[in-house]
Swiss-Prot record:
Organism: Nitratidesulfovibrio vulgaris (strain ATCC 29579 / DSM 644 / CCUG 34227 / NCIMB 8303 / VKM B-1760 / Hildenborough) (Desulfovibrio vulgaris)
Record's subcellular location: Cell inner membrane
Translocase found in the keyword field: yes
Name of protein: ATP synthase subunit beta
EC number: 7.1.2.2
Binding partners and assembly: F-type ATPases have 2 components, CF(1) - the catalytic core - and CF(0) - the membrane proton channel. CF(1) has five subunits: alpha(3), beta(3), gamma(1), delta(1), epsilon(1). CF(0) has three main subunits: a(1), b(2) and c(9-12). The alpha and beta chains form an alternating ring which encloses part of the gamma chain. CF(1) is attached to CF(0) by a central stalk formed by the gamma and epsilon chains, while a peripheral stalk is formed by the delta and b chains.
Gene that this sequence comes from: atpD
Positions with a binding annotation for ATP: 156-163
Keyword Phosphoprotein attributed: no
Recorded family membership: Belongs to the ATPase alpha/beta chains family.
Membrane protein topology class: Peripheral membrane protein
């Protein structure tokens, strides 16, 4: 079958209109290849068909810069959506939105390629059992448990440790569960993407991860599709290799933002706050593919940027409806030197429920939150009148809350260079046992410092013993 070839008739920014012979129009979402006749060494420009305008013209979104395109240039229909290489060959590599390597390590020799657009798994294929995914991070496992095949939002400003938590999870899932991670860099800083690559290389977790980048400097077409490229990679590991996969998206807001940038160029009427009218549909098509099936699961952690801290903005508000939980990082906690700087009172998880995690886990988690909340309420009194004015009961609450607060800190494997302390993976039962002991007053004789930057409660007891011996 001869290639279906059209000609460019108009270029407006990232949007390219192509005219095809009558009766040979490419399907919507098909990829078109445009060769640059002036530079035969340059890779083809890939465009994705977005609309049929009539008169045999299709409107497409370019996945790369459109400089140098002229009317009359040929565009060939590939007959299928954008295809990306998947499988073991993609691990340890950086790809762009169309599956081309950008790490200068040569071609990706994958046996199989998958389209980036696929239907979400059927209802009958989905796994209805709710399971907890152990991350080995105490504060997460105890208070904000991750559901297998769920979606968690990671909220935090600049410099409070979002990327370090993401890297530690990639490390723990790879080392403890032998799991694969896929990282989608959507519209974020190229420098951060470069840093993440080198840090993961140094931490030895790169060979268990595939990185797909479409950063800030890319045109909106690439940023609006790079999350789908990453999802196609993750789906292969779930459906074919039967793996539990972690999918990291940094940042999900940029996916929506890119959609709104091309929406106006496609001639759609904007909706609230200038976003695309298809905001809910676009996000739903992505999020519904992230789920547990009978073969494996994709658990997603998505960093969410909240524009102007307005949680009612349509982009974060639409994202919230898909999330199973929120992990909020707090600058106040980071200032105390407690890392991971997770806010135990602001963060929530749908599966912190006695029917899912068990009565003991649920009871300990809620008691920890109660003690920390009481401490927060007492802080104003302490600041004005000092500790001496508190009742004996309140003094005990404050002492235990401060121990709990410090015990929520933990040395990370990927942060060994900063902390000088070897990283620790803490099993869920050890986490529950430790916090239960603090709540029951079993460790009231230990100093607050004994609980800081340790793994399990045994490490705190060792610290105490060492101090006693001195």
């Amino acid at each position: 079958m001869s290639a279906n070839i059209g000609k460019i008739v108009q270029v407006i920014g990232a949007v390219v209109d192509v005219e095809f012979p009558s009766g040979q129009l490419p399907n919507i979402l098909n990829a078109l290849d445009i060769k640059n006749p002036n530079n035969t060494d340059a890779p083809d420009l890939v465009c994705e068909v977005a609309q049929h305008l009539g008169d045999n013209i299709v409107r497409t979104i370019a996945m790369d810069a459109t400089e140098g395109l002229v009317r009359g240039m040929e565009a060939s229909d590939t007959g299928k959506p954008i295809m990306v290489p998947v499988g073991k060959a993609s691990l340890g590599r950086i790809m762009n939105v169309v599956g081309r390597p950008v790490d200068e390590l040569g071609p990706i020799n994958a046996d199989k390629s998958l389209p980036i657009h696929r239907a979400a798994p059927e209802f009958t294929e989905q796994n209805t059992k709710v399971e907890l995914l152990e991350t080995g991070i105490k504060v997460v496992d105890l208070l904000i448990p991750f559901p297998k095949g769920g979606k968690m939002g990671l909220f935090g400003g600049a410099g409070v440790g979002k990327t370090v938590i993401l890297m530690e999870m990639i490390n723990n899932i790879a080392k403890q569960h032998g799991g694969i991670s896929v990282f989608a860099g959507v519209g974020e800083r190229t420098r951060e993407g470069n840093d993440l690559y080198h840090e993961m290389k140094d931490a030895g977790v790169l060979e268990k991860a595939a990185l797909i980048y479409g950063q800030m400097n890319e045109p909106p077409g690439a940023r609006a599709r790079v999350a789908l490229t990453a999802l196609a990679c993750a789906e292969y590991f779930r459906d074919v290799e039967n793996q539990d996969v972690l999918l990291f998206v940094d940042n999900i807001f940029r996916f929506t933002q890119a959609g709104s940038e091309v929406s106006a160029l496609l001639g759609r009427m904007p909706s609230a706050v200038g976003y695309q009218p298809t905001l809910g549909t676009d996000l739903g098509a992505l999020q519904e593919r992230i789920t547990s099936t009978t073969k494996g699961s994709i658990t997603s952690v998505q960093a969410v940027y909240v524009p102007a801290d307005d949680l009612t903005d349509p982009a974060p508000a639409t994202t919230f409806s898909h999330l199973d939980g929120t992990l909020v990082l707090s600058r106040q906690i980071a200032e105390l030197g407690i890392y991971p700087a997770v806010d135990p009172l602001d963060s929530t998880s749908r599966i912190l429920d006695p029917n899912v995690v068990g009565v003991e886990h649920y009871g300990v988690a809620r008691q920890v939150q109660q003690v920390l909340q009481k401490y927060k309420d007492l802080q104003d009194i302490i600041a004005i009148l000092g500790m001496d004015e508190l009742s004996d009961e309140d003094k005990l609450t404050v002492a235990r809350a401060r121990r709990i607060q410090r015990f929520l800190s933990q040395p990370f494997h990927v942060a060994e260079t900063f902390t000088g302390t070897p990283g620790v993976y803490v099993k869920l039962e050890d986490t529950i046992k430790g916090f239960m002991g603090i709540l029951n007053g079993d460790y009231d004789h230990l100093a607050e410092g004994d609980f800081y930057m340790v793994g399990g409660i045994e490490m705190a007891l060792e610290k105490y013993k060492k101090r006693q011996e001195q």
